[in-house]
């Protein structure tokens, strides 16, 4: 419905508002998370699967075109019961000879898929043993949140090997402090 008045075109107000509403509905959200935040979030969610009472670490491996290839978390090897092995950090028998780190689990969980050129997201900077698996598998970038053990021999060796092998590592900085997952169905809100 258009009205002509002295050679000008006037559109009734209700039609203008309807058009404006349609335009606003067709605009994308501005508060979405980045790819890096998304994949680090997946790694953090994977960490929630760890049975380790002290340290929960998750990892996520992503292809060059941002497709998740694999995830992993720190835990006992497949077939080894979480209830039959130690979780202690100090003492006569500790978890250290048994636990598979998140990064290694993510590489192994890829089940032979090509990881060349991929990115790995992990909460804690990889140790020297995980760095070897990362390098050998062809991962080319590592994003991490914490470098808690930066001065340890294992971390220093890890950084040295990754630099020599051309694996880029970057501490992920984000304004996000947390992401909340809501499992309540819409009809129950």
Protein language model regions, located:
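Zinc-dependent deaminase catalytic domain
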Residues: 7, 15-189
């Amino acid at each position: 419905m258009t009205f002509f008045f002295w050679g000008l075109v006037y559109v009734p107000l209700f039609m203008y508002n309807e058009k404006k509403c349609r335009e606003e509905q067709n605009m994308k959200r501005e508060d979405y998370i980045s790819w890096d935040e998304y994949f680090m979030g997946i790694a953090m969610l994977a960490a929630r699967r760890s049975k380790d009472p002290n340290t929960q670490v998750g990892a996520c491996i992503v292809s060059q075109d941002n497709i998740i290839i694999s995830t992993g978390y720190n835990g006992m090897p497949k077939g080894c019961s979480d209830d039959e092995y130690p979780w202690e950090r100090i003492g006569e028998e500790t978890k250290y000879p048994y636990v598979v780190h998140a990064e290694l689990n993510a590489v192994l969980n890829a089940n032979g898929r090509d990881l060349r050129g991929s990115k790995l997201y992990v909460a804690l900077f990889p140790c020297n043993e995980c760095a070897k698996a990362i390098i050998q598998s062809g991962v080319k970038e590592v994003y991490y949140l914490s470098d808690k053990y930066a001065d340890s021999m294992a971390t220093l060796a890890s950084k040295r090997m990754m630099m020599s092998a051309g694996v880029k590592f970057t501490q992920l900085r984000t304004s996000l402090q947390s992401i909340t997952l809501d499992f309540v169905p819409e009809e129950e809100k």
